[in-house]
Amino acid sequence: MSARLLPPRTVPELARRRRDPVSKQALAEAAPIVDAVRAGGEAALREYAERFGDVQPGAALFHDRAALGQALARLPAGDRARLERVAERIRGFAEAQYRALCPVAVSVPGGVAEHRIAPVERAGCYAPGGRYPLPSSVLMTALTARVARVRDVWVASPKPRALSLAAAAMAGADGVLAAGGAHAIAALAYGAGPIAPRDIIVGPGNRYVTAAKQLVGSAVAIDMLAGPSELTVFADDAADPGNIAADLLAQAEHDPEAIPVLVTLDPGLPDRVATELARQLRDMPSAAIAQAALANGGVVVVASVDEGIAACDAIAPEHLQLELRDGAGVAPRLAHYGALVVGTGAAEVLGDYGAGPNHVLPTGGTARSTGGLSVYTFLRVRTWLRIDDPAAARPLLEDAIWLGRAEGLEAHARAAERRLGTLTS
């Protein structure tokens, strides 16, 4: 296969080619912007938004519910119907996740221990603009926050088009900030104009967005530090090389730093996919971006299904797509991925565009330790301890006294001892 398209790689080589999602340069450039917006609020936010071309001087920086509703009302009927259909699938999946949650109550000596689940109050949802404005990301983030019962939801997106504003209305957002980059993240974190400081900021963005999320991470929760988009396709000799090429290109066109990978049991498949890649690139508008991304990824040829599973788990990609005769049998054996796509009629793009599961997913191998955006991202588990029968709680008090002294924390032991003393006095 041509080295200019999808070169042969080993799994360790692919791991070495991954970059940290937050570079020193991006941090250095984002930090003064974040500090300025934190100190200067709306005035500083507007200055940066106009400087970076998010809005024209004097143009609206904040779109309230009324403006979003107008954008939705002006949407052509066909576009609105399709957007509603996508939104309903995303909402339905998120609602099913929410229904799976339940409170917990466990009896303890003298009382009960509980956990209760509650949403954060304010969420900020970032949706990329720039090269490819993503109304799908507006739905994936803001709609999921609303399903989680978040009270106050703002979206930030640079140069939002009518479709993105309409998507925000459909998601139930309270408003849209027409700005991106580090200044938008700072506005969400610390507040600016009508935006109160957020409790959590979610959503994918460029390296400056990601750097800013790291910078504000001590003041506000964040979902993840996302790097370039990734797709790994695990295929055998029954796979359609044209479909594989199309799916790899769909991921590659996101970003010249995207990482498309083919893991295959068939040594001949890479050449067939290479032919398809070259053919499909000829008339693709984003060919230059996609071709640059293909060079970041590669092909890993494996000798067995077990070796292929090990390779996929070591890569731990954002998206993992199975093009195997027994994909359904292999799927449960895989451990590390952000989203898994299985079946001859399935494609990763269906997950991107609203089959139901969320498309905001972990990258850079972090799928080993975390999952994608969901209603759980916006929820807090709060624990309760209630003691109704102090006499029955004696074992708790005795154990607390013992542990306090075992750890050298005498005040802890004495606090428990006082309660025990009231039972014997």
Give the ranges of each region predicted by the language model:
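Short acidic-hydrophobic, aromatic-tinged amphipathic segments that line or gate anion-handling sites
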Residues: M1-T10, G175-G180, V299-S304
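Alpha-helix C-terminal capping segments
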Residues: M140-R151, A169-A171, A189-I195, K213-L215, ...
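N-terminal Rossmann-like NAD(P)+-binding subdomain of aldehyde/semialdehyde dehydrogenases
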Residues: M1-E121
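Conserved small-residue-rich beta-alpha loop and adjacent elements
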Residues: V104-A167
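C-terminal core of ALDH-fold dehydrogenases
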Residues: D313-S425
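Conserved NAD(P)+-binding/catalytic subdomain of aldehyde/semialdehyde dehydrogenases
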Residues: G172-V261
